[in-house]
Design a protein with these regions (language model features):
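Catalytic glycan-binding domains that act on GlcNAc-containing polysaccharides
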Residues: 54-275
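Bacterial N-terminal signal peptides that target proteins for export
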Residues: 2-15
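Cleaved targeting-peptide boundary
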Residues: 29-36
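N-terminal signal peptide c-region/cleavage motif recognized by signal peptidases
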Residues: 24-26
Length: 275
């Protein structure tokens, strides 16, 4: 039976007051291009983190006391590495000692290398090349920034707010599950974590506990670092047994790690020299 039309009731008294109050409630705090609105934005984000299931303890320990970091914004506005030609980039970032170090590590750790190759189907020299290029085998991780504070600053900044808010929520998830503490999460200005520089969302999705201690530690555990890097490549379509030089399908998978063509070519060349 069709419903009968009915008259819209008029709002009176308290009901009207509630509606007007709701209309006057400020919208979610907006992004900004300076420090002025950061604290309001942060309070709003804490509420969203709680709604997303992050524990009160993690929100308090990770986000309490952080502030807007202008040095992060300066670094973000002054990126130049990937504007270089391949020859310029390779000459600046790769040395003979970087190659020999990687080759030597593979020779000395063949059992671990074989385990990673067998499990993920990715040649160890590709994984080690990424490790070497990203942080000089863990030696140059860039400990100058609080990763949580850097990500909060970039999430508040209007340039790529949605992307970095996703990364900030992910890093809270890493802390919440007990993989790392906020204090351990120090690194570069863009929020990458550990020895091969995982962004937090990728860390949550692809990190592997390969040393068997129950934690996925991409800062201190080399087995976890290399296995997680191989797992990322496998998950993005790496074809076991295939090549990785330009023109191959696996060369395209390297682009999922870093979109810069000079980076992809550098990894392929480095890996070829480590075999």
């Amino acid at each position: 039976m069709a419903s009968r039309p009915y008259a819209q009731p008029r709002l009176k008294g308290a009901a009207l007051a509630v509606l007007l109050a709701l209309a006057a409630t400020p919208a979610a705090a907006k992004c900004g291009n300076g420090a002025g609105g950061f604290e309001n934005w942060l309070q709003d984000f804490k509420g969203r983190a709680a709604s997303d299931g992050i524990s009160k303890g993690t929100i308090s320990s990770a986000l309490g006391g952080i502030g807007y970091d202008s040095k992060v914004i300066q670094r973000d506005r002054n990126q130049h590495s990937f504007k270089l030609s391949f020859q310029e980039f390779y000459a600046r970032r790769v040395s003979g000692s970087l190659i020999s170090h990687g080759r030597g590590w593979i020779n000395k750790n063949q059992a671990l290398a074989d385990r990673i190759e067998k499990r993920f189907g990715v040649p160890i020299e590709v994984v080690v090349a990424i490790w070497g290029l990203e942080t000089n085998y863990g030696a140059d991780r860039g400990q100058g920034f609080s990763i949580v504070q850097a990500l909060a600053t970039l999430a508040y900044d209007c340039r790529r707010a949605d992307f970095f808010e996703t990364q900030l929520m992910a890093v809270l998830g890493i802390i919440d599950r007990g993989d790392m503490s906020a204090g351990q999460l120090r690194g570069g200005w863009a929020g990458e974590i550990g020895q091969t520089q995982f962004l937090p969302a990728a860390y949550l999705k692809y990190a592997v506990d390969f040393d068997g201690n129950g934690r996925r530690d991409l800062v201190n555990s080399v087995p976890d670092v290399l296995a997680s890097t191989a797992n990322f490549l496998k998950a993005h379509g790496w074809s076991a047994g295939g090549g990785y030089q330009p023109g191959s399908s696996n060369f395209g998978v390297i682009a999922e790690w870093n979109k810069a063509q000079v980076y992809q070519r550098t990894i392929a060349v480095m890996a070829g020299q480590m075999k």
